[in-house]
């Protein structure tokens, strides 16, 4: 028996609503329209500018960002607020939203060990932060890569493909199976820092809009 055109099953309606909500959520996350970024520049001067920017950022042992995240995987979508603080090699990421959908804190020590504490007080530890987050959230989030990518840097232990503009700002990074696209920057203390970025891999899309950067000083 064929189904009449224009008639939908309840499941179809629910799926459509989920998809619509996902698209609206991702659209709202990126906010207004940013000015288009310039074309990629393959000149030695552009490469040197990227390396100079990298050296300046790597020299900072403390920084902080506040951002909104949106992750889409299949028909699943969640959003979260992120407060990421770094001081003397220790990363503290406070998330409101996921981790049992109640939020929690992820701490990365200088030796690479990860500790995740949910809002309900559950504690999880692992040497691999990506595997730890995937086990607790059930989603693939490349935390170890984002330590670098969120600042527009390359992970030093992975092969890569990179596009930069004439000023040395990253436009697109391909690394560890992820594509990271940068859509907007702002100047913070003389450095171009990402404002909006999109990470994609095998049907997973993670978007970030950074509302605040602090470079150096006390990030608490």
Which stretches of residues belong to each language-model region?
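Sec-dependent bacterial lipoprotein signal peptides
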Residues: 1-33
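Bacterial Sec signal peptide processing site at the extreme N-terminus
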Residues: 27-51
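A short, Trp-centered hydrophobic/proline-enriched beta-strand micro-motif
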Residues: 55-75
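Solvent-exposed loop/turn segments connecting transmembrane beta-strands
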Residues: 73-77, 98-103, 202-203
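Extended lipid/amphipathic-ligand handling interfaces
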Residues: 82-85, 105-108, 183-187
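An acidic-aromatic
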Residues: 90-140
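Solvent-exposed helix/loop surface patches that form functional interfaces
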Residues: 131-167
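Gly/Pro-enriched, hydrophobic low-complexity segments
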Residues: 152-220
């Amino acid at each position: 028996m064929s189904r009449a055109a224009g008639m939908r099953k309840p499941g179809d309606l629910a799926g459509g609503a989920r998809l619509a909500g996902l698209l609206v959520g991702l659209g709202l996350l990126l906010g207004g329209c940013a000015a288009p970024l310039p074309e990629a520049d393959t000149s030695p001067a552009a490469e040197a500018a990227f390396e100079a920017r990298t050296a300046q950022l790597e020299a900072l042992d403390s920084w902080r960002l506040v951002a909104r995240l949106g992750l889409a995987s299949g028909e699943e979508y969640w959003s979260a607020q992120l407060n990421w603080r770094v001081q003397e090699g220790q990363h503290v990421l406070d998330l409101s939203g996921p981790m049992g959908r109640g939020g929690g804190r992820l701490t990365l020590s200088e030796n690479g060990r990860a500790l995740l504490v949910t809002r309900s007080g559950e504690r999880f530890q692992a040497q691999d932060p990506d595997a730890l987050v995937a086990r607790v959230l059930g989603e693939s989030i490349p935390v170890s890569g984002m330590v670098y990518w969120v600042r527009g840097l390359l992970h030093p232990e992975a092969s890569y493909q990179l596009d930069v503009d004439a000023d040395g700002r990253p436009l697109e990074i391909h690394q560890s199976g992820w594509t990271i696209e940068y859509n907007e920057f702002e100047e913070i203390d003389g450095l171009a820092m990402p404002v909006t970025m999109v990470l994609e891999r095998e049907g997973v899309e993670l978007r970030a809009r950074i509302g605040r950067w602090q470079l150096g000083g006390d990030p608490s």
